[in-house]
Amino acid sequence: MNQTRVFLIFAWLMVAALLWMEWGKDKAPANAPTPIASQAVPAARDPDAAAPAANVPSAQAIPQAGSPAAVPATSTTTATPATTGAAPAITLTSDVLRLKLDGRSVLDAELLQFPQTKDGTEPVKLLTEDAAHPYNATSGWASERSPVPGVGGFRAEQPGTTFELAKGQNTLVVPFVWNGPNGVSIRRIFTLQRGSYAISIKDEVINKSDAAWNGYVFRKLSRVPTILSRGMTNPDSFSFNGATWYSPQEGYERRAFKDYMDDGGLNRQITGGWVALLQHHFFTAWIPQKDQASLYVLAQDGPRDVAELRGPAFTVAPGQSASTEARLWVGPKLVSLLAKEDVKGLDRVVDYSRFSIMAIIGQGLFWVLSHLHSFLHNWGWAIIGLVVLLRLALYPLSAAQYKSGAKMRRFQPRLAQLKERYGDDRQKYQQATMELFKKEKINPMGGCLPLLIQMPIFFALYWVLVESVELRQAPWLGWIQDLTARDPYFILPVLNIAIMWATQKLTPTPGMDPMQAKMMQFMPLVFGVMMAFMPAGLVLYWVVNGGLGLLIQWWMIRQHGEKPSKIIQANAK
């Protein structure tokens, strides 16, 4: 049987299987997890200091910070009783973010540049107080024996509840303070930058009491995962949903919400890393100081999945101060903005694959795609341009693949004679076949290797188109006004069916089993149905790729002295 045909069947079936596996992955509804009892967790004054987790180490495992600094003599911080009662919610607004916070937790976060729907005005709400699926980011302090701020403990230093980045300003700075008993205070500064989704949160502990103060900072992301609808009509279910983290030693790792505690609570001390919660196109992340170690913990708190950093811990002597700073990212997976953060491994949140080699291929493809967009100013034309460049680059492999298949077809009559000569003696038939291949210098796998080299590239391109938030709600032309939504009139899927059908007719199939031939007739229809509900950008890729493949097939047939009309007639028999 024609080797090109065999591996074309294999490729199509493999694509279908992988697509179905990826659709089924990470989107099954997760049952509400059973709360896990705390084990050896520091008895903090703050009731929410640390989420319960299995096998959590004792307070001694929290990384210790460096030596604190002396409090400047000019400091005018005075000791006041600990604040009681809930602090009023504060709203911070930049050109890209609107945050609702209480000084300790970011309760709501709206992404002002990203509407929920193509024609809508409501922005995407990434963090939310929604009762069914709450999702927030918290930075607090915990201690076994020293006073720490609890919920509502931080108060804005400036009057008012609304702070907005003014025109002409690039930075919005809003300070908060907690005044504890006996002269201990913690000053917290929120800083928002124009055009940035990274929020700087800096804490300074000032001890003007007569005793040493001990405590550690914790930063956590907590959410009740949204149950994603099953099926091809929901692009959000294509993507990875869960926690990811990075360490210089182990690199990028991830844990899906549906398998959140299957491998335990992590409990790993890391310096120079970060932790994040991912969903389709958007994510939140805590990025601590590169030189300060934290204990990374995954936990479940009732129905909530928690990703948390604990530490560093501080011992602040009387008259001393200590500080720590972290960035909270609340926003899209925009490659250009992630690069500006200069955080190692953060580009992996654009989750092209959990495998490094596939992620590298995906990053390279997006680099080309983004440069094409900067020239063409349209993501649809950029996709077409990328496919054309890929086809040109892979043309030598396609030529080698077809050449190998053409050579095999020329020897089909001799193979048929060998089969007739040796009848049911498969061993002698195979031995004679291999001798023929050796004599005529035929590589039976010659059509396979080029295909195997191309497949990782096309798989990576598939995930580039799924994952890239840059394509979200981007138009192409005419009826395609959103490349991440399905084709409203199914024009591209129908074109895809026609191209696949024509490709089948132009693919020589000498000696193909009648049952296999009948199965192959249904492949265009099967793929057409699958593509009908996929994002239009993906279907556009398949249509252009298939159309160019059809032209190359026609050209190769003529180059090797074969006639397309004869192949079509042979396949029709």
UniProtKB/Swiss-Prot annotation:
Taxonomic superkingdom: Bacteria
Chief localization: membrane
Chain spans, region Disordered: 63-82
Pfam families: 60KD_IMP, YidC_periplas
UniProtKB keywords: Cell inner membrane, Cell membrane, Chaperone, Membrane, Protein transport, Transmembrane, Transmembrane helix, Transport
Subcellular compartments: Cell inner membrane
Membrane topology recorded in Swiss-Prot or TrEMBL: Multi-pass membrane protein
GO CC aspect terms: plasma membrane
Membrane-spanning segments: 6-26, 355-375, 379-399, 446-466, 488-508, 524-544
Single Gene Ontology MF annotation: membrane insertase activity
InterPro entries per the UniProt record, alphabetical: Membr_insert_YidC, Membr_insert_YidC_N, YidC/ALB3/OXA1/COX18, YidC/Oxa/ALB_C, YidC_ALB_C, YidC_periplasmic_sf
GO annotation, biological process: protein insertion into membrane; protein transport
Keyword Nucleotide-binding attached: no
Entry keyword annotation includes Transmembrane: yes
CDD domains in the record: 5TM_YidC_Alb3, EcYidC-like_peri
Function of the molecule: Required for the insertion and/or proper folding and/or complex formation of integral membrane proteins into the membrane. Involved in integration of membrane proteins that insert both dependently and independently of the Sec translocase complex, as well as at least some lipoproteins. Aids folding of multispanning membrane proteins.
Record's subunit section: Interacts with the Sec translocase complex via SecD. Specifically interacts with transmembrane segments of nascent integral membrane proteins during membrane integration.
UniProt record similarity statement: Belongs to the OXA1/ALB3/YidC family. Type 1 subfamily.
Name used for this protein in its record: Membrane protein insertase YidC
Organism: Xanthomonas campestris pv. campestris (strain 8004)
Gene that produces this protein: yidC
